[in-house]
Amino acid sequence: MGQWLPDEFIRRVTKEFPDHAKALIHSLSNETATDRTLRCLQVCSPHEIEGFEPGQRVPWHQEATYFTRGGAEGLRPIHSYPGYQAGAWYVQEAAGLMVHRLLEHLRTEGAPMERLLDACAAPGGKTLALLDFLPKGGILVASEPMEHRLALLDATLARSGSDRVIMVQNQAQNWQGLPGFFDGILVDMPCSGEGMFRKHREAAKDWSMDKSLTLAALQSKIMDSLYQALRPGGWLIYATCTFGKEENTGQLLPWITSGRLEPAALSLPEDWGWVHASVLDQRWNPRHAAWWSIPGLTQGEGFFCSVLRKPIEAKRNDYPPKETLQEPSILREELKKQMRVYKGGLASHPSGYPSPELAMAYGKKHGHYPQTGPWSVEEGCPIVDLDKTLATWFCQGQNLALGELRNGWNLMTYQGLGLGWMHREGTRVQNHFPKSLRIAR
């Protein structure tokens, strides 16, 4: 059992998870990762996906459905479907969707949500969850330290259609320059990735206890920085995709015992299969929000998450609650002092778009840059709604000589959601779907 898993890993989970290790090791060793979910974001058209076989609803997210793909060999990739490109739906691993449930609880409790930070945002699934709870007038900063992963985040946000996100490239341990700025912070910590062994076996080959301890030291630095950036009364969601205590409960307990952070109170139904931290460590109160998703027990990959609050009595910050939200450019300039704002970040005009590189000029008369995504549909703009075949061709970059095209800029839509732009000048037609997002023919 577990022949390809590191021996040291097996010994450790057997010690730390005595009642759950057998199911965990068996699942990691013998089962294929199949717990993908499709989450509806706008109108939902998952049945366009070849071989799509919907399963049950995800218990902790009622807009997400488990699915499989019958005869998956040779089928088109998920991202090649126009519904995905239009932002109608998003595919995400099931356990990570627990973040949505935690955010629901925070909203019910009246937690502040006007200034949010996703500290390790790529590829963007949890950023989308934060956007669901961002109030009108709020701003979300999505930060990613790795250059090649910023492009993934950029594409996800373009498809989402949000105009309230500033993307930045910043190390997660470098937020102390904005003391007490954020109402809420989500950090999906860099970790040893033990929860992904079933999905990525190569991760097990690179695993070692020394690597786990090195990452735990980095996590500690990140927590120091994020704590400074969190306002008194604010909240923090801590997450990893690993099992070891040193990267999870071991990180949080010093903050709790010192009184600098307080765990939120939240319970989950037992039949969801999540394992509470108190089962493994008696220092945790069963009412405190901290759980593991354990393959073999939970219908999801390995994942840990917890919710904590910064006491109101903590030192006040230098940023009055509303001061920096009146104009997005103010926040952008504040961030520029501390880090690189990715591709200009959020434009300074009221309907700013998050990624100027993806924007297409919509005539000199309008003086702004329309974007891909569902919010690019504007009154008075020439619109051509495409069927599945034409939408696929458009996303491949083909120039479609459609009779409905008017001279100038035309917005291509799919099921009413914006895909991108075609430009016609007489008999000449040019496809302006971003090259970085085009799907293979």
Language-model-derived ranges and their functions:
Residues 111-122:
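Conserved class I S-adenosyl-L-methionine
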Residues 123-136:
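Conserved SAM-binding loop of SAM-dependent methyltransferases across substrates and taxa
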Residues 143-180:
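S-adenosyl-L-methionine
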Residues 180-182, 235-238, 242-335, 340:
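Class I S-adenosyl-L-methionine
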